[in-house]
C-alpha cells in the first residue's frame, strides 16, 4: 500500500524577488477549436534558456522543447530533432499554439496582462504567496478560440 501513496507537496520557497532561474512541474492543457491536448509539463528556466519536457498523462516523455541563444530544438520521442529560430514556433508545431515562455513565466510570477486586442486574456485562478512573490498555482489564458490552462504542482527557485 505504501507504494501507492503520493509524496506530500514540497513547501514553497521564500522568495524576496522573482528568480531568474526556476523549475516548475505540473499539467498543461491546450484547446483550440476541436483540438485538445493534455500533458504533464516539467519546465526548467535559466536566464538564457528554457527546457520543456512534455509527457503523456501517464508520464511517458512525448517531446522536449529547448531554447537558448542559438535557437530552439524540438525532440519528439522516436523522431529526429527539429530546429527553429524560436521556442514559440516549435510549441505551435507540437501543440498547435505558439506559447512564449517569457509570457508564461510572467504569468507564473503574478503578472497578468490586460486583454488588449490580440493578447492573451489571463486569469490567475489560484495563487500562493512565496515570501514576497505571488506564485500562480492555476492559470487560464484565452486568446480567440484558444484556451491554455496550466496547473503548477511543484516549483523551486534555482541558482543561475
Please identify what each model-predicted range represents.
Residues 49-100:
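An acidic-aromatic
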Amino acid at each position: 500500500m505504501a507504494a501507492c501513496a503520493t509524496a506530500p507537496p514540497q513547501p514553497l520557497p521564500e522568495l524576496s524577488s522573482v528568480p531568474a532561474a526556476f523549475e516548475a512541474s505540473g499539467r498543461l492543457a491546450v484547446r483550440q477549436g476541436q483540438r485538445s491536448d493534455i500533458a504533464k509539463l516539467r519546465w526548467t528556466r535559466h536566464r538564457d534558456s528554457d527546457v520543456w519536457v512534455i509527457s503523456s498523462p501517464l508520464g511517458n516523455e512525448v517531446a522536449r522543447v529547448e531554447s537558448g541563444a542559438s535557437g530552439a530544438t524540438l525532440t519528439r520521442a522516436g523522431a529526429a530533432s527539429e530546429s527553429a529560430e524560436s521556442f514559440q514556433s516549435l510549441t505551435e508545431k507540437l501543440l498547435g499554439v505558439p506559447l512564449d515562455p517569457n509570457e508564461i513565466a510572467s504569468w507564473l510570477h503574478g503578472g497578468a496582462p490586460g486583454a488588449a486586442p490580440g493578447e492573451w486574456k489571463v486569469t490567475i485562478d489560484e495563487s500562493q504567496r512565496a515570501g514576497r512573490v505571488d506564485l500562480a498555482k492555476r492559470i487560464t489564458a484565452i486568446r480567440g478560440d484558444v484556451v491554455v490552462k496550466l496547473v503548477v504542482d511543484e516549483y523551486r527557485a534555482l541558482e543561475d
